[in-house]
Amino acid sequence: MKYHQSIIILPVVLVSLLATAADGQTKQNRFQNTLTGADKCLDIINDGNNNRPTMAKCGNIPGQRWIISASKPNRKFYRLKTPFTGADKCLNVVDDGERNKLVMDKCDNVSGQRWSIVPSKENPGYSGYYLLKNELTGQDKCLDVIDDGRNNRLTIAECSQVSGQSWKINKAP
């Protein structure tokens, strides 16, 4: 099977997650976090609006399948979409002054929908993990899971060497 590479400057592992098969099928990925472990995945709450991301028990469900696509015009950033909300919705950081609330929103050319996926080099214990950073919030802030005992709420927080910011990206089942 032939693959078209979406971008070549990322590590080989991430590039393979961005590839599109020759038959037009887009690869779908699962995001898991070190804090929540292998049994929880990045998901969308099915609340009628289908717009709030959360960490939920992993399953073979559309809200946990994510498509990573190069963001135009700036291809060093990516958009994160899930088939559950449709091709016209992207993971977005709300530009509300606090800039820490995440929603699925109509895809547009806004910095809150552009993500960089950076190997977690500063966390040597998390080899093979990534930090998810957003253009709106800057490269010193990361997607984080709030350690509140339930470990399912997401926020944008100052990047630090914490397990809630280390993401494993695997091919979805």
Predicted segments — roles?
Residues 10-17:
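Bacterial N-terminal signal peptides
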Residues 24-173:
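Lectin-like carbohydrate-binding module/patch detector with strong preference for beta-trefoil
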Residues 1-9:
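Bacterial N-terminal signal peptides that target proteins for export
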